[in-house]
Amino acid sequence: MEQNSRALIDGFNRKIDYLRMSVTDRCDFRCVYCMAEDMQFLPRQQILSLEELFQVAERFVALGTRKIRLTGGEPLVRQGIVDLCGRIAALPGLRELCLTSNGSQLGRLAQPLFDAGVTRLNISLDSLDADRFKQLTRTGDLAQVIAGIDAARQAGFKRTKLNCVVLKGRNDHELVDLVRFAIERELDITFIEEMPLGVISEHERGESFCSSDEVRARLAEQFTLVESTESSMGPARYWRLAEAANTRVGFISPHSHNFCATCNRVRLTVEGRLLLCLGNEHSVDLKHVLRAHPGNPERLEKAIRDSLHLKPYRHHFEVGGDVQILRFMNMTGG
């Protein structure tokens, strides 16, 4: 394996080479598992500027980061996002620049993003029923999202992945249809267990929880699943479909099969806090460092390195228990 003498290694000897960066807390959807319907967003002066986001990305890549994922909120509602993507994609040593989107803006931005150097897209799709999609997203238009998915394919994106958060009693009866949709378009699809982030009112998390094992068992009734050793440098575990060579089915299972032992990532919130673990509040304020010491990459690098001693071995998510993390997913970076 390629080694970088400046690589980031945490206290449990895990190499940190994957950074997830939230570029905005704003979104044109209000998904029931992600944020409150009347969400109050941060004032502009409290969030990182595009230049500050780039400076953090640049420093992480210099320290051995090989994959960066831009998230939100919805990253494509941030003005200047395409130019930011182009600057980050050009950083020497970065292998992948990925972006997670709800798909609503891809009809107009898929081609510019591809041309800017974004290598892969993840697109959220929790239902193929227009009414249910509207219920789950509160404001989303299914036809617009599907048009965005198709625009991404036409732009030239490969290995585009659909993300589906599975909620028992709300969309779990659509699992097979969602896989068939992915097969038709030669997409990957990942089913995600809901994470206990933020206080929500639309459903009781303990009652809506659907484990990855249950999802996989249902899919196995319709498809031949072959376990794969492939990795996307993230937490998903993949299965191949004997019936469809161009589609992989993944599972992200923070509850039933936590992936902490091999965790290789940290997250930057839009307000500049470096989160060492999705399931803990341990963080370091990089915005303060950036603004107190402008143009000083050495101070930023020291803050990043010093933060690693805060990274815990694992999270302690519990199904149906009290909400352990009060921040919403749109604040964390979905």
UniProtKB/Swiss-Prot annotation:
SUPFAM superfamilies: Radical SAM enzymes. InterPro entries: Aldolase_TIM, Elp3/MiaA/NifB-like_rSAM, MoaA, MoaA_NifB_PqqE_Fe-S-bd_CS, MoaA_twitch, MoCo_biosynth_MoaA/MoaC, rSAM. SMART domains: Elp3 (SM00729). Keywords: 4Fe-4S, GTP-binding, Iron, Iron-sulfur, Lyase, Metal-binding, Molybdenum cofactor biosynthesis, Nucleotide-binding, S-adenosyl-L-methionine. It catalyses: GTP + AH2 + S-adenosyl-L-methionine = (8S)-3',8-cyclo-7,8-dihydroguanosine 5'-triphosphate + 5'-deoxyadenosine + L-methionine + A + H(+). GTP binds at residues 20, 69, 100, 161, 265-267. Pathway: Cofactor biosynthesis; molybdopterin biosynthesis. [4Fe-4S] cluster 1 binds at residues 27, 31, 34. Monomer and homodimer. Belongs to the radical SAM superfamily. MoaA family. This is GTP 3',8-cyclase. It comes from Pseudomonas putida (strain ATCC 47054 / DSM 6125 / CFBP 8728 / NCIMB 11950 / KT2440). The lineage of its organism: Bacteria, Pseudomonadati, Pseudomonadota, Gammaproteobacteria, Pseudomonadales.
